[in-house]
A protein has these predicted regions:
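Peripheral, non-catalytic segments that deliver or gate enzyme domains
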Residues: 1-190
Length: 190
């Protein structure tokens, strides 16, 4: 993606690296962030509104016309902005929507041919959360009942039974997790 005007409205170009020719017509007015499908047939991208907020998530089939792009998710609140990313274990896409102090997240399986994002937990004013998956478990980095955050763990997202994985600590900001093959790295600031 490229922002040639300095406006932070990015244009996405998909180019064949061998022929150096664009495969797809340019996709304009995006956040610039691109998430590829695991089979490299699709990209997911965020369209920006006139207030420069991510509002809609689209799926584009590489090589097809952009007017055929499929709307996957639309954020209705003008106060919130939306983005999409792949889970650490590459089994789910997570759609994140948030303002400065409230968030909400949706997910769908990478194998879904017609993605239908499912809500993880409804937004509650002042509650931030971010779920990721790794090794058959789901990890929730949240400030719910934890001013400086904590990390909970669950076996599924259909009916999650969240258990404490890393408890909140007084005057210690619990950062997120990074997942490696044999390690989980966490960040803390005191």
């Amino acid at each position: 993606s490229l922002d040639i005007k300095g406006s932070e409205y990015y244009t996405i170009y998909i180019r064949d690296i061998q022929t150096k020719k664009n495969i797809t017509k340019e996709i304009t007015e995006t956040s610039g962030s691109i998430t590829f499908s695991l089979d490299d047939k699709y990209i997911f991208y965020t369209k920006l509104d006139e207030n420069h907020r991510g509002r809609k998530i689209y799926r584009h089939e590489i090589g097809n016309f952009t007017n055929e792009d499929e709307l996957i998710f639309e954020e209705k609140s003008e106060a919130f902005t939306v983005s999409i990313g792949l889970s650490s274990d590459e089994k789910y896409y997570f759609i994140n929507t948030s303002d400065h102090n409230t968030s909400e997240q949706y997910y769908f399986n990478v194998d879904e041919h017609k993605p239908k994002p499912k809500l993880i937990k409804e937004r509650q004013r002042g509650i931030l959360y971010s779920v990721n998956s790794w090794n058959g478990k789901f990890y929730n980095h949240t400030n719910e009942n934890a001013e400086d955050f904590k990390i909970d763990i669950a076996d599924n997202l259909e009916k999650p039974d969240w258990k404490t994985f890393i408890a909140a600590k007084e005057e210690v900001l619990i950062g997120g997790l990074t997942f490696l093959k044999n390690w989980i790295i966490r960040g803390e600031t005191s």
